[in-house]
Amino acid sequence: IMECAFQLVEDYGCENLIRIGTCGSSDPNIHVGDTILSTASAAESNNTVPVFGEYDFVPTSNFELLKAAYDCAHENGIAVHVGTSGCGDVLYKEPDQPESYRNPWKGYPMIAAEMEGTGLLVATARYPHVRGLLLITCSDHQLYSNEDTPLAQRETAYNNMMKVALETAYKMDKEAQ
């Protein structure tokens, strides 16, 4: 996703990039279908090395964009969780692997795990005029694996996420004019 983000900025002049999609969680306060705004994205591996060399970098969502999304969600009666997410390299890890491999953030306050966030936020951090945000919906939960979410409820959850993203983009574009 990092290369795609660079292309959107360099070739198309995009200034607000919002990653929408699904994530997993092991936070007991989050359930399948909940909407999450990620404040920062910690990488599981060294995928920031091509950009930062030997230095670690944990990119953050742009506060203005995050606040606009938070406000849009609340204006529409959509509850959101706000916190740090982890960006993994592998979606489904083998159960016979050590716990430290299957859940590298256990014991840390990561409210979500997904696979694209760090790349997007690293790319947007490169440009002073570009803002990035991770807006994700919990689709899988390690603690509540028995939560069976009906199709209509999943559609509502994903629609809520998209509504927040589109209204946030509209609001940011309107303010820029």
Go through each PLM region and give its residues.
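Generic structural signal for well-ordered, non-membrane alpha-helical segments
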Residues: 1, 58, 62-66, 78, ...
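Metabolite-binding pocket within alpha/beta catalytic cores that recognizes anionic/polar moieties
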Residues: 1-67
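General beta-strand structural signal in soluble alpha/beta enzymes
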Residues: 16-20, 37, 80-86, 111-115, ...
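Short acidic, glycine/serine/threonine-rich loops at helix termini
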Residues: 28-32, 48-49, 96-97, 125, ...
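Zn-dependent metallopeptidase/amidohydrolase metal-coordination segment
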Residues: 118-153
